[in-house]
């Protein structure tokens, strides 16, 4: 049997880049909660003792940016300089301006255009992907790496492993076979976890706790065997972390946010962007399209691409490839997709309810993946039935 290895990684909510994603989306949530027509392009950067938010926001919402920054950092666990950042004492810098009037008139006519006439906020191309190898219809490498990271955070916050600190990274290598274009996981080849920790714990204790409380509950036993390799804090020491260890920036974990390297990526980040930004809304709708193709049984694996021009409502192109796993020709699946999904930005915002903020709606997406999540706020995960005409 011919097999191959594929690897995906993830990072925890305390990773400095992910901290920035969560701050940007927390600000988006706050704006949309008060003003669903908010136009938000919010970036965040961080380094030792500093968080800065900057970008373009046009909204009637009254938002205390500094308060949101501090509360987001605090919720993650950055409560002292020892762990990498002190939410209550760090410097918070804010440099927010209005959306460019040139962009505003071209995209939404300064809020005068009907939803179906709203243009894309920028050019770009986005990809959605789905595969039948997991119940989430997501790649197993990505699912396991992401769940390991989420479990690290869980056992830190519930004090199962009190020595844990917020920052951390995971990586999983899976051995696969290709069955006519479909991906069949055989076994987990390698598990890598690098997690920030306090001064009280030894490397041996870290390894024991990670295997017992993080790896065992997450990775099904059928995928582990005596040859599975474990690299647990292989650098030997990870006390300094968070923004103290590395600078962070919104939008630097776009593969972790999506499919762990499977499928393809158009390059646009998600966090801090309202739904007129097709980097986000376009990627969400093509995930729904690809997932619906696989869930409906039209293919075992599927990728969908959409592309846009700034100011133009209709997509320039829609593409589908089922990697030769389709039960009907790809051109017929493309027809079904175009009939079932409205790719115009204004209509995507309505159909996926993307103007609704609050309840950490978008902040939740900013750690542990935007896709494959079982949460009613992730409206793009709802399957649309696609039925070929008789």
Curated annotation (Swiss-Prot):
Per its record, what are the GO molecular function terms? ATP binding; metal ion binding; methionine adenosyltransferase activity
Q: What is this protein called?
A: S-adenosylmethionine synthase 4
Localization per Swiss-Prot or TrEMBL: Cytoplasm
Q: How is the cofactor bound?
A: Binds 2 divalent ions per subunit. The metal ions interact primarily with the substrate. Can utilize magnesium, manganese or cobalt (in vitro).
Provide the binding site for L-methionine.
Answer: 56, 99, 246, 277
Q: What does this protein do?
A: Catalyzes the formation of S-adenosylmethionine from methionine and ATP. The reaction comprises two steps that are both catalyzed by the same enzyme: formation of S-adenosylmethionine (AdoMet) and triphosphate, and subsequent hydrolysis of the triphosphate.
Tissue pattern of expression reads:
Mostly expressed in flowers, seedpods and roots, and, to a lower extent, in stems and leaves.
EC number of this enzyme = 2.5.1.6
Matching HAMAP family, A to Z?
Answer: S_AdoMet_synth1 (MF_00086)
Q: Name one GO biological process term.
A: S-adenosylmethionine biosynthetic process
Q: Which residues bind ATP?
A: 15, 167-169, 235-238, 246, 252-253, 269, 273, 277
Which reaction equations make up its catalytic activity? L-methionine + ATP + H2O = S-adenosyl-L-methionine + phosphate + diphosphate
Q: Specify which residues bind K(+) according to the UniProt entry for this protein.
A: 43
- Requisite cofactors: Mn(2+); Mg(2+); Co(2+); K(+)
The record's listing under PROSITE patterns reads: ADOMET_SYNTHASE_1, ADOMET_SYNTHASE_2
**Pathway annotation from the record:** Amino-acid biosynthesis; S-adenosyl-L-methionine biosynthesis; S-adenosyl-L-methionine from L-methionine: step 1/1
Per UniProt, the keywords (alphabetical) are: ATP-binding, Cobalt, Cytoplasm, Magnesium, Metal-binding, Nucleotide-binding, One-carbon metabolism, Potassium, Transferase
Residues that hold Mg(2+) according to the record: 9
Quaternary form? Homotetramer.
Q: What species does this protein belong to?
A: Brassica juncea (Indian mustard)
Q: What is this protein's expression induced by?
A: By polyamines (PAs: putrescine, spermidine and spermine), methylglyoxal (bis-guanyhydrazone) (MGBG), and salt.
Gene Ontology CC: one annotated term:
cytoplasm
